[in-house]
Amino acid sequence: MKNKIFYLGLVLILAITGCSNSNEKELIESDEVSGSSSIGLIDDERILSAESEPGNWLAFGRTYDARRFSPLKQINKESVSDLGLVWSKDMGTNRALEATPIVVDGIMFFTSTWSRVYAVEALTGETIWSFDPKVPGEWAKKACCDIVNRGVAVYNGKVYSASLDGRLFALNAETGEKIWEVDTIIDRERSYTITGAPRVAKGKVYIGNGGAEYGVRGYVTAYDSESGDQEWRFFTVPGNPDLGFEDPAMEMAAKTWKGTDWWEFGGGGTVWNSIVYDADFNNIYLGVGNGSPWTREIRSPGGGDNLFLSSIVAVDADTGVYKWHYQTTPEDNWDYTAVQDMALADMEIDGEMKKVLLQAPKNGFFYVIDRTNGKVLRAHPFAAVTWATHVDLETGRPVENPEVDYSDNGAWVLPGPLGAHNWQAMSIDLDSGLAYIPTQENPFFYAVQEDYKKTGIFKWTPGKWNMGIEMSSLAQNILNNLDSQPKPGGFLKAFDPLTGETKWSVPIPHYWNGGVLGTAGGLVFQGDALGMFSAYDKDTGERLWEFNTYTSMLAPPITFEVEGEQYVSILTGSGGGDLFGGEPLPPIEIQALSLIQI
């Protein structure tokens, strides 16, 4: 009998693009309450023991280790051909969905555009409740890369979400009612935004922000998960030294900024994506973003590494006190953020078991870092890299390539500002020792802003992009240098972070594709920009199954199990950084798939 694809239900949720008010009638009012919940009962111990209940997806990266690899294997190489659509849910928007759903005890929690939050039945997609934070529509102009949101945290009967305009909410997981709300933004004269998912651990909620291009100063704040009271705040770049320093780490960092009043430009260093809790060392790892402006000769003309830009910073989970850092791109000059997903693992390196942190950031090198002290152990390129020749493991520093120095005449550089790997999630498979990475090679023609070169004065414009890069003549610069442009492309790669070997690589027609999920069923799932959701053989890269969603994908898939049956789910629809490509954005859905009974 021929396999069937069938719909169990389609729910329409209406919205008006360009403003935040939803036409959908909320099932739950958002008055502040203090009621308890009987669902969403996730605590530290449950996440730490997540391997004992693989049917749930309890945290942003599935576990605190954030490897995004599932032990479920009912859907495997032999059975994946029977995978078919169970339900889809129209989210009523033509903008990107980027969230990682949390699934616990048959209920799925996720976010949509404008920071709206949903709880749905995982088996049917039926809405249980929804919450709209009613972000002012004009806030869209403050967001660098669309009105997106990457998800929620669920903890002790509450759902934690952050809004584009910088508020943090605790919602009753059973009803969606608001329990508390706090304003996380320190200066509303600056264009701060939040698109990232909160993280939870040790009775705290951790959240960062975005807006580096607009001239903000980055920081991460920890709030008490029950009351919403602020527990600590860690700034990632120093402020005005004349006003004193918040802590010794900022005093240390200020010595690496030279020659200008950098604090007037904000400095950047926003933590807009990756925050990881490490129970082994009671650390919180912060993935820190780019400088404001991008160009170092404007930002810090006297030189210096500009800490903690483009760094992984370890702080104490209870106090926020600095422990160590590793800077992936000292003196960042290219928008090479280190906000990309981080994963934790125990790996044998040089004959010794090491507790390591793994990251494949924008700059194109895959870092294996000792979690005890921040020392880099491996740093192999996982994509085409021209800005540096290699990373010196003795010094821990990259060796820059002078042939692509763009300070005088401009130059094509790989990676470009979208990075060799961006926020789209990778998956770490410890059994094979491989990382499955959504990789891209998208060159950019960098040149210093012409007005600055002529006058020596950088005109910072509040509320606008302040990169220090020549953009007004970018198109002409590209046309003038087409002959030397490196070829762009997208790839799904299986990469060995210890040896630097690419085991297999699958080319994908577009470079801006979705996140990745690996499973013990021998599969790697990914959605791509052309609408194809695919399952690959994790050993060879062979495509074993595909499903046309008819809309682009950026979000990472997840998998879960309900009543003994495994499902795969993905939020579909493109946007975010892809808006710069001017591509049409079709309607957006969330979809759930399972093995079809025939």
Annotate each PLM feature.
Residues 15-18:
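C-terminal motif of bacterial Sec signal peptides marking the signal peptidase cleavage site
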